[in-house]
């Protein structure tokens, strides 16, 4: 088993450089960006109490289209309304963008689950991000404990 930091760095590094950007509803992944070398863009700032304006959404849509980003991410603790607006906006400009999966940001997974631990949360987030953005990672995650949970994202049988 790779240590989680090494697994995360190698997994994120396997994403094509031009696609190495994580787009989420709000800016809760600054730590992840710094630790593992992925750019983070969000519709909202750090707080979820204010809504982004139309101009904010349009700028992010333009970014998605210009960079040809294939996937953006919903968060377990944040409404997906802004993500849906980004997907629709990109589609109106001819860019297909999908939901790459759900990430754990301000809250870990359910208590008593692997994703409910810090290691499980990092493993889950890293595996989901890498699979959605074209990286090379085991579908079951760092040590196979995500088997069957991230399978649909991989496109593999």
Model-derived regions: residue spans:
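Extracytoplasmic metal-acquisition and chelation regions
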Residues: 1-157
